[in-house]
């Protein structure tokens, strides 16, 4: 199966004539030889375990499961330097991993152990508007908070992440759900060009209509296994002011039922009636929630309006708030507002798992009840944990907007919608709890599928790549012809994969 979310490839050796690899120690592992070569060639951007830059790149992840201690870290700031590293990796036959913002919680999706080299995007921090401000050049070493901060006072934004702490490259190449997606589609639908290094060590720029248009298409949701990206050029959108915030609704049974009803109705009608509106509901329980499961929603309106009719089910008197930050602001201010909260959980362990259903109230109830019934059965022995269910209502309009600027590997049919995509996440503290978390997520997945089948409720095959757990069959949900095309494209640009 097409790996999609991981770029940890072993590139076999080729003739040495293309490079001069002098005075590299004999008897070292392929990774150690590569590290020595990179250090001799680029001493300022090659680091080892006793250096602060290595420590940052090896530990600054969304989940501590990604701290794997590579042989060395190479952090270039230019595409040509990265190209030299790719050729060295190929010559020595060293495994490697590439990291962007470090948000994917699957450990080996963005790091590698001492058998390989970590290529860090942290040096690719360029942010530059085009002369007419129609596009923004974005280096993959940024986070979305950096992007929104750069665009402050320009009246522009990007179809990017909903939280400032999220990284850039994995988000985009997995599709990317944005606040703005109901108007403009996937984040990946708003790429103007992508520059990166392919397996041969060549630096290429892919656009919809140049010689690398197939690569451009693959990177619009096919994952990051096609090139090492050094820059995105993203189409800008007008967004001088937005209305956004998080509303908490409490823990009562009535709140739960109305919260579920609101999700279902927004999937059917809200996203269709208001293309400026987005709702990201979440329900959380765990050791930090002594009063029981707490129901919240992150609400968004593209403009200045706290009373959009499409969001009425998320406000009083239907759902009464216990706290509310929904207010007019900017994407810059919003992206900075939650940093302290995320700093408080930095260094913990996290797992995602994704499910999909059509917009069906019975399915929504089944998944909610199954998730929260199985939490105490599987997770009660954990000293600290937070289990969260995030059912995201995805309207037909989302799929329509994603097709405006051409196709993508997901190729979701608007007439197949609306969907609800469920991100299940567990935050926990120690590695030994991994087996309990894995058993919990697997049990929810299996029980939900069994109960839905018993009720005659069909599920879409599509699973959102960016919320998927390791081993989930993401690409089985892509059209078979598109998967074949993705494999052909990957073989074209990396024949040894």
PLM features per residue range, with description:
Residues 19-87:
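Signal-peptide-cleavage-adjacent N-terminal segments of secreted and extracellular proteins
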Residues 106-125, 180-199, 228-232, 422:
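Structural signature of FAD isoalloxazine-binding scaffolds in flavoprotein oxidoreductases
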Residues 154, 158-194, 198:
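A gly/ser-rich beta-alpha-beta helix-loop segment of oxidoreductase catalytic cores
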Residues 455-497:
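Activity-critical C-terminal alpha-helical subdomain
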Residues 134-135, 142-147, 165-168, 325, ...:
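Short, structural beta-strand-to-alpha-helix junction motif
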Residues 1-20:
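Fungal secretory targeting signals
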Residues 194-197, 204-468:
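C-terminal cap/substrate-recognition region of VAO/PCMH-type FAD-linked oxidoreductases
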Residues 51, 62-124, 138-140:
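Glycine-rich N-terminal segment of FAD-binding domains in flavoprotein oxidoreductases
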């Amino acid at each position: 199966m097409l790996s999609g979310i991981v770029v940890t490839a072993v590139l076999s050796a080729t003739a040495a004539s293309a490079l001069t690899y002098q005075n590299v120690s004999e008897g070292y592992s392929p990774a150690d030889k590569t590290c020595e070569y990179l250090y001799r060639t680029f001493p300022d951007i090659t680091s080892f375990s006793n250096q602060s830059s290595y420590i940052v790149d090896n530990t600054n992840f969304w989940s501590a499961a990604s701290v794997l201690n590579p042989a060395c870290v190479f952090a270039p700031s230019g595409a040509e330097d990265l190209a030299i590293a790719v050729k060295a990796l190929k010559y020595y036959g060293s495994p490697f991993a590439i990291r962007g913002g470090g948000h994917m919680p699957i450990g080996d999706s963005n790091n590698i152990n001492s058998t390989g080299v970590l290529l860090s995007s942290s040096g690719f921090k360029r942010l530059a508007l085009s002369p007419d401000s129609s596009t923004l050049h974005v280096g993959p070493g940024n986070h979305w908070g950096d992007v929104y901060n750069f665009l402050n006072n320009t009246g522009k934004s990007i179809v990017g992440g909903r939280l400032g702490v999220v990284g850039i490259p994995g988000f985009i190449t997995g599709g990317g759900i944005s606040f703005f997606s109901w108007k403009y589609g996937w984040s990946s639908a708003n790429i103007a060009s992508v520059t990166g290094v392919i397996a041969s060590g060549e630096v290429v720029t892919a656009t919809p209509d140049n010689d690398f248009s197939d690569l451009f298409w693959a990177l619009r949701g096919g994952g990051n296994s096609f090139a090492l990206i050094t820059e995105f050029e993203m189409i800008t959108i007008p967004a001088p002011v937005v209305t956004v915030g998080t509303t908490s609704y409490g823990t009562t049974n009535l709140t739960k039922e109305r919260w579920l009803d609101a999700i279902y109705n927004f999937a059917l009608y809200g996203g269709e009636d208001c293309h400026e509106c987005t709702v990201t509901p979440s329900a959380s329980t765990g050791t930090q929630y002594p009063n029981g499961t707490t129901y919240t929603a992150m609400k968004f309106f593209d403009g200045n309006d706290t009373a959009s009719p499409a969001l009425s089910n998320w406000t009083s008197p239907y759902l009464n708030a216990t706290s509310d930050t929904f207010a007019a602001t900017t994407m810059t201010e919003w992206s900075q507002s939650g940093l302290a909260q995320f700093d408080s959980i930095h260094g913990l362990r996290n797992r995602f798992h994704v499910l999909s259903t059509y917009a069906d109230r019975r399915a929504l109830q089944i998944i909610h009840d199954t998730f929260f019934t199985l939490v105490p059965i599987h997770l009660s022995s954990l000293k600290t944990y937070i289990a969260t269910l995030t059912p995201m209502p995805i309207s037909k309009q989302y799929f329509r907007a994603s097709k405006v600027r051409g196709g993508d590997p997901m190729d979701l049919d608007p007439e197949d919608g609306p969907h609800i995509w469920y991100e299940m996440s567990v935050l926990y503290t120690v590695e030994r709890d991994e087996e309990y978390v894995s058993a919990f997520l697997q049990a929810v997945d299996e029980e939900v599928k069994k109960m839905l089948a018993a009720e005659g409720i069909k599920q879409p095959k599509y699973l959102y790549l960016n919320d998927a757990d390791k081993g989930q069959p993401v690409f089985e949900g892509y059209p078979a012809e598109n998967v074949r095309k993705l494999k052909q494209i990957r073989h074209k640009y990396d024949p040894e994969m």
